[in-house]
């Protein structure tokens, strides 16, 4: 199981990262709660990936990590609904500041997989 560390990222453009060699996830402590959660879930998606080929398969690995993030955000969000029928993709995406069409499609697919 990966260890979690927080770092002072005020002077960095990096919100977080997974260090394969040490099996640790590092998160910028100056992110708000939503962004910390998004970064944590994204970086958890890199755990177990064969990162020695990262540069060759970067797009695939990042997409898988984003899907993992969305999956876990949905697991957090769905219990807050009174009825599963109340789920609204746009509201979910607004709540977690997700903006891309790719994110939207992943939300729809992951939601369908969960219900």
Walk through the language-model features, giving the residues of each:
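Active-site hotspot residues in diverse enzymes, especially metal/ion-binding acidic/histidine motifs
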Residues: 1-115
